[in-house]
Design a protein with these regions (language model features):
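Class II aminoacyl-tRNA synthetase catalytic cores and aaRS-like
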Residues: 1-588
Length: 588
């Protein structure tokens, strides 16, 4: 194909306006579409700023003959004069002008693409990911990546203004026993030894605080080899930060300023600050989860006490600290739910471990219920009165282990709100969730593990329970939640070696494990450690909010699938036997 020669682009395809009429311009880009009207050919030329209509007349035979052979996605260089269009297109910013071509160079041809290069293309996701370089030509995805670049700059500017230093930390580190599985990298030089790719820069950023760097940040790739859900990726980006000589409120206040700046600059929205605080315990009681969506009601009600003496054993058997009977009431929306729809909701909550879904309906004073014959009138009325807010009611009840009840009702309230179109996607309800439990019980391992990570500072008044009553210990930890998604989380860190060792002991890590995995880290605590804390945002989730998408793949240039594969490159792939031998690995 031809080169550009001496021609160099003077404008982008989305820039030209009426004020540019009569200018000679040079544009370069891809052919969006072409229309041959016989004596006149129109070409829509596209780059990442937009589209300009190119007009080629038959009075210039050389250019006209070239233009007749042009197809979609050919790469062109066009030199011509800007003129006002006779038939204007108000759907695009350049719709008042066109360029009359005087010179046309085909820089490259193109095969027929396997997907349409337009935002409303409905190609299967697998095809889009295989040809991601074509998918990324779509204006929507390009705009998302531009906004991501702008967001990165805003974050850097804000943190720089607040005394932070951008410092890189190593990608090749030590495997750790806590959290998700590590991605391991075999060492060729050190036989039978492995590096781990970082799940976060946690230890290194704390060491930077011990080093006296005071304020650190990094926009960094992290890696977790875990089972993937819809909006999880095996490699993801964190906005990671750490601050010395701070407590919880200092970290939260600084980050409220960052959130306010990002949403104002990117979305044009004023986020009220200070952002409301809610304890973990309150969030679980009211919403059944630690990342509540506050844009709608349907709060959980605990009715365990009302039915603890009921003859209905499904309810009365749940009267202990690990079980409960709870419900949500959707009020006057009850008329939207037929028995058939309720049956579908029951099937839905069973996906969360529930054995069934009880319900009570009140319509114009008449009571219907799936459990009417099992409850006394007094019990039925007490449930209705304790939950009723509207004239009518539809109460959904779960009775089971607390985690099943919370998970089931939380998912149910979210589903109903979305099914009923009660969620305003242009509203952003932020909340800080604080006072998390320091530990959670892992039934698989039959022991307590750190809910966040093992370097989190316990609340001072709870340290006494660290080794004796782990369920009582609350953490100086905080998550920032928006519209039902956790977009960031952090904590104040332990800054005392004795307390850190006690934390490891509470996690049942042996002295050998502590020394092997964290010896270097605990050793650093012997040389003066400042109070410090930090926070990390999931950059991909943050971008989903900022651009308004519910698909994480819309904000990542080259995402993986839910099975952690890259359909574009074919990764992961088999490795040559010679390469395996060099790193001392033998496959079964």
């Amino acid at each position: 194909m031809n080169s550009m020669g001496n021609l160099r682009r003077t404008h982008m395809c989305g820039e030209l306006r009426l004020s540019d009429v009569n200018k000679e311009v040079i544009l370069m880009g891809w052919v969006q579409k072409e229309r041959n009207l016989g004596s006149l050919i129109f070409i829509d030329l596209r780059d990442n700023t937009g589209i300009t209509q190119i007009a080629i007349k038959d009075d210039n035979k050389e250019i006209f003959d070239k233009a007749k052979d042009v197809k979609s996605e050919y790469v062109l260089c066009v030199k011509g004069d800007v003129r006002e269009r006779e038939s204007k297109n108000n759907n695009i910013p350049t719709g008042e002008i066109e360029v009359i071509a005087k010179e046309l160079i085909v820089l490259d041809t193109a095969n027929v693409p396997p997907i349409y290069i337009k935002d409303d293309d409905n190609a299967q996701e697998a095809v889009r990911l295989k040809y991601r370089y074509l998918d990324l030509r779509k204006p929507k995805l390009q705009n998302n990546l531009k906004l991501r670049a702008k967001t990165n700059k805003l974050i850097r500017d804000y943190l720089d203004e607040n005394g932070f230093y951008e410092i890189e930390t190593p990608f090749l580190g030590k495997p750790t026993p806590e959290g998700a599985r590590d991605y391991l990298v075999a060492s060729r030089v050190n036989e039978h030894s492995f590096y781990a790719l970082p799940q976060s820069p946690q230890l290194m950023k704390q060491l930077l605080m011990i080093s006296g760097m005071d304020r650190y940040y990094q926009i960094v790739k992290c890696f977790r080899d875990e089972d993937l859900r819809a909006n999880r990726q095996p490699e993801f980006t964190q906005v990671d930060m750490e601050m010395s000589f701070v407590d919880q409120e200092d970290v939260m206040t600084l980050n409220e300023g960052l959130i306010k700046k990002l949403f104002k600059e990117i979305r044009g929205i004023d986020i009220p600050t200070p952002i409301k605080r809610m304890t973990y315990a309150e969030a679980m009681e009211r919403y059944g989860c630690d990342k509540p969506d506050l844009r709608f009601g349907f709060e959980l009600k605990n009715i365990t006490e009302l039915v603890k003496d009921s003859e209905f054993k499904v309810f009365s058997s749940c009267n202990d600290k690990n079980k409960s009977v709870r419900c949500i009431n959707i009020g006057n929306y009850e008329s939207e739910y037929s028995r058939k729809k309720i049956d579908k909701l029951e099937k839905f909550v069973k996906e969360y471990g529930a054995k069934g879904l009880s319900w009570i309906r009140v319509h114009d004073g008449e009571i219907q219920s799936s459990i009417k014959k099992f409850l006394s009138d007094e019990e039925m009325n007490s449930i209705i009165e304790s939950t009723k807010e509207d004239e009518n009611a539809l109460i959904f009840i779960l009775a089971d282990k607390n985690d099943i009840v919370f998970n089931g009702l939380s998912a149910l309230r979210n589903k109903i709100a979305r099914d009923m179109n009660l969620v305003d996607n242009d509203t952003f309800e932020f909340v800080w969730i604080v006072d998390f439990p320091l530990f959670e019980f892992d039934e698989e391992e039959n022991r307590f593990v750190a809910m966040h990570h093992p370097f989190t500072m316990p609340k001072e008044e709870d340290i006494q329970y660290l080794l004796t009553d782990k369920e009582k210990v609350r953490a100086k930890a905080y998550d920032i939640v928006c519209n039902g998604d956790e977009i960031g989380g952090g904590s104040i860190r332990i800054n005392n070696s004795d307390l850190q060792k006690k934390m490891f002991e509470a996690l049942e890590l042996t002295e050998e494990m502590i020394e092997n995995k964290f010896g270097f880290f605990v050793e650093a605590f012997n040389y003066g450690t400042p109070p410090h804390g930090g926070l990390a945002y999931g950059m991909d989730r943050l971008m989903m909010l900022l651009v308004g998408t519910d698909n994480i793949k819309d904000v990542i240039a080259f995402p993986k699938t839910q099975s952690a594969t890259d359909l574009l490159t074919g990764a992961p792939s088999n490795v040559d036997e010679k390469q395996l031998k060099e790193i001392h690995i033998k496959l079964d």
